[in-house]
Amino acid sequence: VPVVMAGVLGIYGLIIAVIISTGINPKAKPYYLFDGYAHLSSGLACGLAGLAAGMAIGIVGDAGVRANAQQPKLFVGMILILIFAEALALYGLIVGIILSSRAGQSRAD
């Protein structure tokens, strides 16, 4: 279970990468400095949140699998803690989407 939850974090990064790459089209419109910083901040927000969530999932998953072998009643508690750790990355994805959507809004035309 922890391996699957850790794999989802990579998908969150892929989603942000696709959103950022669709916002970059220098032939259709100029790419302003604000757009670059918005895309950079959205990638960093999702990436750092994914890093923190991955570390939490790794630590909790390791301890949970070891404890589950000794006492199977701890499985539900382990899953709940893993879900809360996954929520960290989901919040980072949401913030990244919000920041990336701001990329085309500040124009000095």
From Swiss-Prot:
Pfam families found in the cross-reference section: ATP-synt_C
Lumenal-facing ranges: 21-39, 100-109
Tissue expression pattern: High expression in the mesocotyl tip of etiolated seedlings compared to the base.
Oligomer and partners: V-ATPase is a heteromultimeric enzyme composed of a peripheral catalytic V1 complex (main components: subunits A, B, C, D, E, and F) attached to an integral membrane V0 proton pore complex (main component: the proteolipid protein; which is present as a hexamer that forms the proton-conducting pore).
Topology with respect to the bilayer: Multi-pass membrane protein
Classification of source organism: Eukaryota, Viridiplantae, Streptophyta, Embryophyta, Tracheophyta
Organism: Zea mays (Maize)
Compartments it resides in: Vacuole membrane
Keyword vocabulary terms for this entry: Hydrogen ion transport, Ion transport, Membrane, Transmembrane, Transmembrane helix, Transport, Vacuole
Gene3D superfamilies named among the record's database cross-references: lithium bound rotor ring of v- atpase
Origin superkingdom: Eukaryota
Classification via PANTHER family: V-TYPE PROTON ATPASE PROTEOLIPID SUBUNIT
Gene Ontology molecular function: any one: proton-transporting ATPase activity, rotational mechanism
Sequence similarity: Belongs to the V-ATPase proteolipid subunit family.
Described function: Proton-conducting pore forming subunit of the membrane integral V0 complex of vacuolar ATPase. V-ATPase is responsible for acidifying a variety of intracellular compartments in eukaryotic cells.
UniProt-recorded name of the protein: V-type proton ATPase 16 kDa proteolipid subunit
Family matches, as InterPro entries: ATPase_proteolipid_c-like_dom (IPR002379), ATPase_proteolipid_csu (IPR000245), ATPase_proteolipid_su_C_euk (IPR011555), F/V-ATP_Csub_sf (IPR035921)
